[in-house]
């Protein structure tokens, strides 16, 4: 506060909150991380019905996915991603909170992978980006960083993308998705 700055801590684990409380600091939740244990993940049974339905509906309507880095995607796809992102940002009253989720610049990183939902007409309806996570120098997971959906896109496209990402990662031997 010496220069008018207010220090802040982000992504604090719950067990540390009493320390901050004892110093008189306030805290609030910006969001919560969901961690999916991929070896056990599937879309079978009543418990997964709300995840399975958007996947089944999207596939029935001709939706498919494409996975790759920004450089691996065609120019036609990257232009659509940029258009979707620009439209999404323009609709928001506030600027993006870059400290919680990434933007288009991070999606271009060569280590980041994108999963696109592409409809039967070849139009991108949604996109997610995934940053690799590492344990002891070995990639063990992917972390969701960027989510965009076409303004006129079908309901359930994000559920479709996240479920398809989980299944793909599981099949590739990845342990964790968050």
Show where each model-derived region lies:
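A conserved beta-strand-loop-helix scaffold within acyl/acetyltransferase catalytic domains
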Residues: 1, 5, 9-33, 38-54, ...
């Amino acid at each position: 506060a010496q220069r008018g700055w207010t220090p802040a801590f982000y992504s604090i684990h719950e067990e540390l909150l009493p320390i901050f409380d004892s110093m008189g600091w306030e805290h609030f939740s910006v969001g919560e991380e969901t961690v999916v244990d991929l070896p056990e993940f599937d879309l079978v049974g009543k418990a997964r019905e709300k995840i399975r339905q958007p996947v089944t509906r999207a596939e029935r309507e001709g939706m498919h996915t494409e996975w790759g880095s920004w450089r691996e995607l065609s120019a036609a796809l990257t232009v659509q991603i940029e258009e979707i992102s620009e439209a999404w940002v323009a609709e928001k009253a506030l600027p993006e909170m870059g400290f919680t989720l990434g933007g288009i610049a991070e999606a271009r990183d060569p280590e980041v992978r994108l999963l696109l939902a592409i409809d039967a007409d070849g139009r991108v309806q949604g996109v997610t980006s995934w940053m690799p996570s590492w344990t002891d120098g070995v990639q063990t997971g992917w972390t969701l960083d960027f989510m965009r959906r076409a303004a006129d896109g079908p309901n359930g496209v994000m559920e479709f993308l996240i479920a398809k990402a989980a299944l793909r990662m599981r099949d590739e031997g990845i342990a964790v998705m968050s």
